[in-house]
């Protein structure tokens, strides 16, 4: 099914982050399953310290949902109207995603308008 092409494990181009995308009801979510740590600390050491909600600042980054509410747009073949969470800054942004001709996943975080944002490219893990 075309809408589920996004599901699976993905690694960013810099090879510093791996996510797993799955369904949640009719929407899609992504969780962090691995990330590179330059300080040599275990992955479960890192907490969501910059979260604006003080109750969430002790949750671990590993396993955290960083992309939620993505909905498949059948007419465009893209995923839209999602929210991406940037744990480095404790901010949420609008999000969209598509799979390009090379089979890469492009996730775009933006502020209200897609042209005001930043994209990340991921390659599917086998």
Report residues per predicted region:
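A mature extracytoplasmic/lumenal domain signature
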Residues: 14, 23-25, 34, 99, ...
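Edge beta-strand at a domain terminus
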Residues: 102-104, 111-126
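N-terminal helix-cap/turn-to-beta initiation motif at the start of protein domains
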Residues: 1-9
């Amino acid at each position: 099914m075309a809408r589920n092409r996004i599901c699976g494990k993905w690694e960013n181009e810099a090879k510093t982050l791996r996510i797993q995308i799955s369904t949640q009801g009719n929407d899609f979510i992504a969780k962090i399953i691995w990330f590179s740590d330059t300080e040599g600390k275990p992955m479960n050491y890192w907490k969501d310290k910059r979260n604006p909600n003080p109750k969430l600042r002790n949750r671990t980054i590993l396993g955290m949902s960083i992309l939620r509410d993505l909905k498949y747009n059948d007419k465009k073949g893209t995923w839209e109207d999602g929210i991406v969470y940037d744990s480095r800054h404790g901010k949420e942004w609008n999000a969209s995603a598509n799979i390009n001709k090379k089979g890469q996943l492009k996730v775009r975080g933006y502020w209200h308008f897609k042209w005001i944002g930043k994209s990340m490219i991921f390659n599917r893990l086998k």
